Amino acid sequence: MTRVVFLRSKSPAGIEPRLAKEAGTLARGGYDVHAILWDRTRSYPTHEVRDGIRIHRYRLAAPEGTVGLARRLPRWQWFALRKAARLRPDVIHAIDLDTAWAARAAARITGAKLVYDVFDFYADMITADVPPKVRERLASAEQRMIERADLVIVPDLRRQAQFRGARPRRIVEIMNVPQDRPPRVRAAPDFTVFYGGMIAKDRGLLDLLAACESTGAKFIVAGHGPDENALLPHLETSPACMFLGTIPYEEVLSQTAAAHVIAALYDPQVPNNRYAAPNKVFEAMMCSKPVLTSDGTTIADLVRSIGCGVVVPYGDRWALQRALEGLMLSPDNCERMGARGRAAFESGYRWEAMEARLLGAYGSLLGSPAAAAPEPPSIG
């Protein structure tokens, strides 16, 4: 049996949705799948099996968004290298740059094929004020990884604009879309805005909070992230907001289905945000919910083209408040937006359309025959 080892330096809710979908697809496709994860909160068992995925966790505490996290990265890389090499995989599936050194070294030791999965382009993702030379070195390191990998996976082919001239040997677009399983839950009694994702300053959370306080909407927030210390005091003390922390993926879907609108604001001044393809937007489409997003992003293009939500300028609180008021005062319009999103989801923005594509890419990588997969629509 062909063995695949995933490397990921995070372990939110035990295993994050995109990784779980990719690894689960390969496990159901007959691969022996392992995932080496970094449990930064020491909240999950060292070893676990989920949906056919054998999970191995490095349980080293590391605070989000601090220098202490960067200092612990070498220890994580060394653990990932040793564990991956011992598993003797046929394929090493590395996610993002903070697994690159370990993945490349383990691939050289074992002779494994190397897959590089770009969830986020590292140099463009960092919002901290780092020296330009450091950012450039990160970009150069990612370019080398992209060119040396046997296969590169991106959630949107337009992310190639971030490659800065790097040319992958093979590349495939695997969109960040959910499996079709909308929960059957009752709508919240009060008009509710739900945000599930990173607790970060570039996600417009304080603007959303102000808009909800002004309009009387309820704001439910779930997730974790680097800016919790700065943002949680505002969120947790507002009567308009309920902060849930990190919750299981099934509860994320339930909150999505119960809400009236799903928030997905991204500051387009952060280069990585312009190409964001967040799971939450496609979960909203699956659950027939309108999306509230910000201009200057790939997601804004998608929402406009489908007509499944409202686009506002990022940071414009007055425009955000007016947009939210419009949604609250027009439930019929919300329903029409949700229906258009659901129709687009069914047409190809769902994981069932990605499974054959992922299995086909792996089959081609390993030289095994694979049926051609139908091409789902591109984002935007």
What kind of feature is each model-predicted range?
Residues G326, N333-G348:
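A short, well-ordered alpha-helix in the C-terminal region of glycosyltransferases
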Residues G24, W78-A85, W101, A105-I109, ...:
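Membrane-proximal helix-turn-helix segments that form the acceptor-binding/catalytic region
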Residues S305-I306, V310-W318, G326-D332:
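Conserved acidic donor-binding segment of nucleotide-sugar-dependent glycosyltransferases
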Residues V5-L7, I153, R184-G216, I220:
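Conserved donor-binding/catalytic core segment of Leloir-type glycosyltransferases
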Residues V261-A264, E283-T293:
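Short hydrophobic beta-strand element within catalytic cores of glycosyltransferases
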Residues N229-T256, V261:
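Nucleotide-activated donor-binding/catalytic signature segment of Leloir-type glycosyltransferases, i.e.
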Residues A123, A139-P183, F243-L244:
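Donor nucleotide-sugar binding/catalytic pocket of nucleotide-sugar-dependent glycosyltransferases
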Residues R8-A13, T25-R72, R159-E173, G225-P226:
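N-terminal strand-loop element at the rim of the active site
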